[in-house]
């Protein structure tokens, strides 16, 4: 048997290749997972864009091939898989798992730190990587899990967890002085939270939480073609295009939550808003315009790392309370986002190598319908 892998060139992520590798016999303590399906979103493009800086390439390292013209990498994705072989006494064949997988049709893991709810991949190369990404949830006891919502879980769960943590991080820090309680955000009063790439799932998940905070106006920034979609969500007080920054008074206290990673936009915001309190860099949906944050006016652009906030809150609240709050927030969000009468997301399925390649190219361009979420599979038939 062979494993089919979807690889990208690390320094030119628009260049891709499909490569088969022979399956080796399992060592003691290993399991083989058939990766059933996985989500592909702008968040995964961020993983690739920051692959070296944030160690995303290290999760599923790619051995060099004689035909490679440059170093290749495997983008991590969130999805579901089934245990098809096991040499570990604590993991049974047939178990369904949710977690962090490569863009492939199978993967070998080495379960460690087993509990009834989950295990961690204890492979040596992942020991230095953050535990949040090494955990695999056992679906039969996962509090997030319902069989009918698997696609939505794969598409939105990791993004919403990040969104929830960004909202919590900003509130935890009192919006770095931008929040002005006693003001009416609906009237354009108080501080401002500017969210770029407002149509992205992580951005609107963040806005969903932020809008409930007093004293802060949530303003989504997007391209002209996505204004109507963003406005239809109802989670932004206002939606503006990227060239409408002058619609916000230059002296208003604000924080910038940058999902786009667009260097020109970041410079424009840092230059216009003299009372910018904090600049939070989340990702890079605008891959063609990624740039650094050096020599900017105002505060330094600071990369948000979700596991740090997880660790802080788990310490303060306790792991059980942290998990309880996160699950409650998830179901509150999906109740709105998955309302059949007005869904925020519809699912498109892409099965087979050619379909996966085409879907990746579309997501990389960042010009698709923001209401569509892409579920991919290299194990299902076309």
Q: Can you name each region flagged by the protein language model?
A:
Residues 268-336:
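Glycine-rich phosphate-binding loop and adjacent beta-alpha segment
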Residues 203-204:
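N-terminal Rossmann-fold NAD(P) dinucleotide-binding loop
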Residues 26-38, 52-108, 113:
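Glycine-rich beta-strand-centered segment in the early N-terminal region that forms part
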Residues 310-382:
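C-terminal hydrophobic helical "lid"/dimerization subdomain
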Residues 192-197:
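Conserved N-terminal Rossmann-fold NAD(P)-binding element of oxidoreductases
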Residues 100-191:
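NAD(P)H dinucleotide-binding glycine-rich loop of Rossmann-like/cofactor-binding domains
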Residues 9-38, 42-44, 49:
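A short N-terminal beta-strand-loop micro-motif at the entrance of redox/enzyme domains
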Residues 211-266:
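Adenosine-nucleotide cofactor-binding segment
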